[in-house]
Amino acid sequence: MKIFAYGIRDDEKPSLEEWKAANPEIEVDYTQELLTPETAKLAEGSDSAVVYQQLDYTRETLTALANVGVTNLSLRNVGTDNIDFDAAREFNFNISNVPVYSPNAIAEHSMLQLSRLLRRTKALDAKIAKRDLRWAPTTGREMRMQTVGVIGTGHIGRVAINILKGFGAKVIAYDKYPNAELQAEGLYVDTLDELYAQADAISLYVPGVPENHHLINADAIAKMKDGVVIMNAARGNLMDIDAIIDGLNSGKISDFGMDVYENEVACSMKIGLVKNSPDAKIADLIARENVMITPHTAFYTTKAVLEMVHQSFDAAVAFAKGEKPAIAVEY
């Protein structure tokens, strides 16, 4: 049996070598190149392909992969919105993803960023860099004094709620599919409008499905408290970034944190320097002292990388054996 992997990063290699040592009977080959119509031929002779990329898995790419006899595709990440499922269905692709690799990684990151926004650490860091040790006017706020609205109470959202409880914050939550334990605690509000009206800070943990596109838009922001803090480490398309910028300009939004961006594949968050980005909004946001940006690295811990590699390769082997792994994508 042979597995071919695309887009293997240097930081993934230790986890891959660990997996190979535990599975010596499996032949593994890989490249740092991403899966494209041109690179699909590299997988010829393999039973499964393991991938991770923000580039789309287009009809052309899937056709090229199927033409070299590979129709088992195992993603090392959770998102599947960049797959042409019509083409995948046409070629009978088996697809898996890694829906749960480390909820703690993303939840911790988002809560740390929210805490930093409340304590105005970016402004303080800028002052320190200028050798300015004066306190004012960078007064912070305590997490325990905030009502924090959590939108989405899946694996990550629930970890975030536990962290918030540790801080002593009042937590309210909204989810179309409530968790029974959280419901018993009385944390849920009935509508997003209720959450918007009550929350001092809002953090999102919902998928980037079409119904959630620009969930946070001008209408939603207008319903929020004045001076609301918004943190998004879920999916970039949840934010209408123009509405966010307008909210920051008006002061309706006091602080904003994001780890994901709607156009991140095309901008410098993925491909290089900010000055080379085709999207001027990134430079605008980065320059603001009340905005904190990370380049889609909320997940990026040693534990998460290990799980993403190990689970995806395990699924690739299962597909090659004609089995259905627990993390197979139903489509």
From Swiss-Prot:
Pfam families: 2-Hacid_dh (PF00389), 2-Hacid_dh_C (PF02826). Keywords: NAD, Oxidoreductase. Disulfide bonds: none annotated. GO terms for molecular function: D-lactate dehydrogenase activity; NAD binding. InterPro entries: D-isomer_2_OHA_DH_cat_dom, D-isomer_DH_CS, D-isomer_DH_CS1, D-isomer_DH_NAD-bd, NAD(P)-bd_dom_sf. Homodimer. This is D-lactate dehydrogenase.
